[in-house]
Regions:
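Amphipathic alpha-helical segments
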Residues: 16-31
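Conserved short beta-strand elements that form part of the metal-binding/catalytic scaffold
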Residues: 31-62, 106-112
Length: 116
């Protein structure tokens, strides 16, 4: 069974969204695609960088996420292949699930967001 990925993104936790948008947009030259106080997407060529607010100001790891056409189908495929399903949350109208791949790496899999 194959999952249909509609977008791959590299997620970066930020404390100050405006400051982060200036850094990634003005300094690094990424193009702003979508902005909100909690979630902002910038692109460089075909890559999407998603800024997500939170983290308490401490250094944190970034992580890889995938948006899929059918989240439930993707979760079945991931578990069938030996991945593990983790915590689920609803973030701004998007259903997100943490998963672990077969090598122990954490990923986020999300359904289609309500904002596009």
């Amino acid at each position: 069974m194959s999952v249909t990925i509609t977008k791959a993104y590299f997620m970066v936790p930020v404390e100050d969204m405006d400051r982060a948008v200036r850094f990634y947009g003005d300094v690094l030259g990424l193009s702003l695609q979508f902005a909100s106080p909690e979630w902002t997407e910038l692109t460089w060529r075909d890559a999407t960088i998603a800024l997500h607010r939170g983290g308490g100001g401490e250094p944190r790891e970034s992580w890889l996420g995938f948006q899929v056409d059918d989240l439930d189908e993707a979760l079945v495929a991931i578990e069938h292949a030996g991945g593990q399903r983790g915590a689920e949350r609803n973030d701004g109208g998007s259903r997100l699930v943490s998963v672990t791949d077969t090598e122990g790496n954490m990923l986020t899999i999300g359904g289609q967001p309500v904002w596009g």
